[in-house]
Amino acid sequence: MFKRNAINWLEKWKIKNNRKPLVIRGARQVGKTSLVKEFAKQFDDFLYFNLEIADDLVLFSKEVSIDTLYEMMLAVRRKTKSIGTTLIFIDEIQNSSLAIKMLRYFYEEMPHLYVIAAGSLLETMLNKDVSFPVGRVEYMALRPCTFDEFLGAMGEDASTYISPTAGFATG
C-alpha cells in the first residue's frame, strides 16, 4: 500500500474531541478498504466487517441495542473488550440500512469506539427509505490517487519533474 494523503485526514479525525463515526464514500476500487486497513495499524484492536459477506451481514439482520451489537461483533471476531483503542470498520455499508442507522447509536452511546463505514453506492441509498444519521456522522470522499501520491508510489517526487527554471528561456 502506498501512502495516501487521506491518512493525514484520518489521523486528525482520530484525535477530535467530539469525534463522530466516519462514512467514507467513493467509487469502486479507489482504495477505501486499503486506506482504512492501513490506518487500523494505529489501533490496539481492529474489527472488520464486510457486508458483502453473509456471515457479517447477519449482524445487521435484526435490530438490537448498540451494546448487544457490539458484544455480537466481539464474539464473531473472538475478541474481548479492550482497554485500548478499538477501530470498527463496516465495509460495503450500503448493503444494510440497519447498519447505517446504527452509526447514530455508536456516536450517542459508545463515543469511545472509533467507527468507520465505507461504501461505493451510498448515493443510491438516498432513494430508498433509509434514514442517514444526519448530524451524527462525518463524511469523507475518497478519490483516485493524486499525482503526488502516484509519484510517491513510484518512489519519486514532483521535484524530479519540475525544474526551478521551467518556463524561462535561456541563452
Residue ranges of model-derived segments:
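Interdomain motor-coupling "hinge/lid" segment immediately C-terminal to the ATP-binding subdomain
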Residues: 127-171
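Conserved P-loop NTPase "ATPase switch" module shared by AAA+ and STAND
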Residues: 80-99
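Conserved lysine of the Walker
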Residues: 32
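Hydrophobic anchor at the beta1->P-loop junction of P-loop NTPases
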Residues: 24
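Structural recognition of the conserved hydrophobic beta-strand(s) that form the central parallel beta-sheet
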Residues: 89, 114-120, 141, 150
